[in-house]
Amino acid sequence: MSYKLKFLPSALKEWNKIGSTIRDQLKKKLKERLNDPDVPADRLTGFKNHYKIKLRSAGYRLVYEVDQGNVSVIVITVGKRERSEVYIKAKKISQ
């Protein structure tokens, strides 16, 4: 079953700011995740139903939430991993 992709407004702004190369890499990974979003290895501790997509070489992270009720994947935030900023931002948004 394929999930629908949704963005929080703040995440969409961040998405539009990143370069096209990084965006293309994230699109490819997101496409895979829409078929199977529950990846235990990428589950974020301290969050409920939140997962990450990592681009190690670029240092970017995308944090998303799986909404089983609406069969959707909601992008919470996108950004550099520097000083765990992307995870701190995700925690603030999710509260």
Task: Place the predicted regions along the sequence by residue.
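Solvent-exposed, charged interface segments at domain starts and junctions
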Residues: 1-2, 41
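Short, conserved clusters of charged catalytic residues that mark active-site
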Residues: 10, 25, 45-48
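Compact soluble domain cores
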Residues: 21-33
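A short, surface-exposed loop/turn module that caps and links secondary-structure elements
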Residues: 31-55
